[in-house]
A protein has these predicted regions:
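Amphipathic alpha-helical scaffolding segments
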Residues: 104-111
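Short helix-capping/linker segments at secondary-structure and domain boundaries
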Residues: 92-102
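Short, hydrophobic/amphipathic alpha-helical patches that form generic packing surfaces
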Residues: 82-94
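Structural motif
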Residues: 73-82
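Residue-level detector of alpha-helix boundaries and kinks
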Residues: 26, 73-74, 94
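Conserved short "hinge" loops at termini or chain/domain junctions
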Residues: 1-67, 103, 115-132
């Protein structure tokens, strides 16, 4: 997924368009800051990336290529890039102007993160062995 797609989803979540469909004036600042915010979120989601891709954390390259522009690909599984990252980005974008809404989007992010990871984690059913 391109970073711009995640950015557009985040803007839609925080409703940054007026009734005529034009962006509000602070969107230019949002766009300038979005690549670095996305890189920070990718770092937060890197452990989840291992889980989703079923890769041992010791085997993954932790030095991912950071995005530089919104036209770059987000180096995450599609489920994380499209279903989780936009909520965190929405939260970070509006943190200074509306901390209550930012907190709401951060809770949505943590819920989405848990849901995606849970969908990829499988456990075998069986008895628990008493080791005492």
């Amino acid at each position: 997924m391109k970073a711009r797609q995640a950015y557009e989803r985040a803007l839609a979540l925080i409703n940054e368009r007026d009734s005529g469909g034009a962006y509000h004036t602070d969107v230019a600042d949002f766009e300038k800051n979005a690549p670095e915010l996305i890189n920070s979120i990718v770092t937060l989601l890197w452990v989840d990336e291992c889980i989703v891709r079923n890769i041992a954390m010791r085997e993954i390259n932790w030095n991912f290529e950071p995005i530089r522009t919104l036209d770059d690909e987000i180096p995450l599984h599609e489920a994380l890039a499209s279903g989780v990252l936009p909520f965190a980005l929405a939260s970070f974008l509006i943190l200074e102007e509306d901390s209550e809404r930012a907190d709401y989007f951060y809770r949505l992010y943590t819920n989405a993160r848990s849901a995606v990871v849970s969908a990829f984690v499988s456990a075998e059913h069986g008895s628990v062995r008493d080791i005492y």
